[in-house]
């Protein structure tokens, strides 16, 4: 449904040029909810604005529903944009118009008749839970209700794609959860493809099917959400995950960690495992079969869209041979193992 091929965006020229996007390839299938995360200034907003050509790429192709938007003339692009709804962090509602009239606005601009506008707006108000707010004005609404109006307005042209630019970052956690539930509901009922950018891992965890990680204008990692939470492939991905899960070794231990193993050290590991493995007596089996003692420093279980994920930080205490055997045993059971460092046994 959405395909970016070698998309780059550069502002300015010469030594002062800013390369906001660098050769981005992205493929979002029809009906998917695809998240893009990254730090502030990484290029997330530029990327999503390139999808509907609010920002025209310096190079590369943007293909939506089989149409290359970068090659369309102004009139064809205007028509294509009807297939691309968009919501933002700020709701951008017209204060002088009611909820109904805000949702109706794009249809008025498209020249839709008043009777057809009513037939299209009322179901959207029902879908977004705003039927009883139809005659109210934005000043009478909460933040979450305003975002629901923005979503309904974005759906008025019956788009095939919804672009979400930090759509929940101005909302409190409870309201964020309700908006995410609404987006999931829209995805299921309408088959809408959703591309969202965010810096909030909770958003990715809650509704995304796949996630991409952008850093300094480059898409450095992309994976199914379950795989990303289990085994992020990059250091930045691990940093995002650990900060979200609050799963870091105690500071006193961090200060003792050494990068390389020695004859009198033992490893400190972060383990991630999912599915049936979560329910197995992992630690007792490991101690029995490999001969190591296991000191659990932190552990937690998360549910990622119905998939159970177990996470643990532990010291494996034993000789180099037994700890090596333990690591091999863990990996043989499809457990993702990250060695954080090594500590002296007599410390």
Curated annotation (Swiss-Prot):
Please give an example of a GO cellular component term from this record.
Answer: plasma membrane
- What keyword terms does UniProt attach to this protein? Amino-acid transport, ATP-binding, Cell inner membrane, Cell membrane, Membrane, Nucleotide-binding, Translocase, Transport
Keyword Cell inner membrane among UniProt keywords = yes
User: How does the record say this protein sits in the membrane?
Assistant: Peripheral membrane protein
Q: Which residues bind ATP?
A: 38-45
What's one GO MF term for it?
Answer: ATP binding
Q: Which reaction does it catalyse?
A: L-methionine(out) + ATP + H2O = L-methionine(in) + ADP + phosphate + H(+); D-methionine(out) + ATP + H2O = D-methionine(in) + ADP + phosphate + H(+)
Which Pfam family is one of this chain's hits? ABC_tran
Is Transmembrane helix given among the entry's keywords? no
Task: Please give the positions of the paired cysteines in each disulfide bond.
Answer: none
The listed locations are: Cell inner membrane
Q: What is its EC number?
A: 7.4.2.11
Q: Name all ABC transporter domain ranges.
A: 2-241
Function statement = Part of the ABC transporter complex MetNIQ involved in methionine import. Responsible for energy coupling to the transport system.
Q: How does it assemble?
A: The complex is composed of two ATP-binding proteins (MetN), two transmembrane proteins (MetI) and a solute-binding protein (MetQ).
**Could you say which protein family the record assigns here?**
Belongs to the ABC transporter superfamily. Methionine importer (TC 3.A.1.24) family.
Instruction: From the Swiss-Prot or TrEMBL record, give the protein name.
Output: Methionine import ATP-binding protein MetN
Q: Which organism is it from?
A: Chromohalobacter salexigens (strain ATCC BAA-138 / DSM 3043 / CIP 106854 / NCIMB 13768 / 1H11)
Gene that produces this protein: metN
